[in-house]
């Protein structure tokens, strides 16, 4: 549904911090998105986390979910960062990690819009690998006009 070129129009992030490779489902009416991140042994964070037992840092799993949620928010508003709007990650609730993400995994990212009040957006997010739960959280973002 969205390749990396279109994703780059909706996310201001760039290598090595762009953590969404493809959007496979985007349902504006249903207010949900499904995307993925292919996790390669060549990711720069594996050099230090951990060299003998590489696992994707949990904070980057959260960031990947937040980026997927950000794409959903931009699409719901029909704006792009180039239009002068950004989303800042400001927090999470009900955060849980279930299993590690390893090199070679495809991290599936799911986000569903919950609410927006005074430019604070909430999304129900979860990540899976091979349909097994990896992480879940309510992601909170602040919408800012530049």
UniProtKB/Swiss-Prot annotation:
Its EC number is 4.2.1.59. Pfam families: FabA. It is an enzyme of class 4 (lyase). GO terms for biological process: fatty acid biosynthetic process; lipid A biosynthetic process. InterPro entries: FabA_FabZ (IPR013114), FabZ (IPR010084), HotDog_dom_sf (IPR029069). GO terms for molecular function: (3R)-hydroxyacyl-[acyl-carrier-protein] dehydratase activity. GO terms for cellular component: cytoplasm; membrane. SUPFAM superfamilies: Thioesterase/thiol ester dehydrase-isomerase. The active site is at 49. It is found in: Cytoplasm. Keywords: Cytoplasm, Lipid A biosynthesis, Lipid biosynthesis, Lipid metabolism, Lyase. It catalyses: a (3R)-hydroxyacyl-[ACP] = a (2E)-enoyl-[ACP] + H2O. Belongs to the thioester dehydratase family. FabZ subfamily. HAMAP family: FabZ (MF_00406). PANTHER family: 3-HYDROXYACYL-[ACYL-CARRIER-PROTEIN] DEHYDRATASE (PTHR30272:SF1). Involved in unsaturated fatty acids biosynthesis. Catalyzes the dehydration of short chain beta-hydroxyacyl-ACPs and long chain saturated and unsaturated beta-hydroxyacyl-ACPs. This is 3-hydroxyacyl-[acyl-carrier-protein] dehydratase FabZ. It comes from Pseudomonas aeruginosa (strain ATCC 15692 / DSM 22644 / CIP 104116 / JCM 14847 / LMG 12228 / 1C / PRS 101 / PAO1).
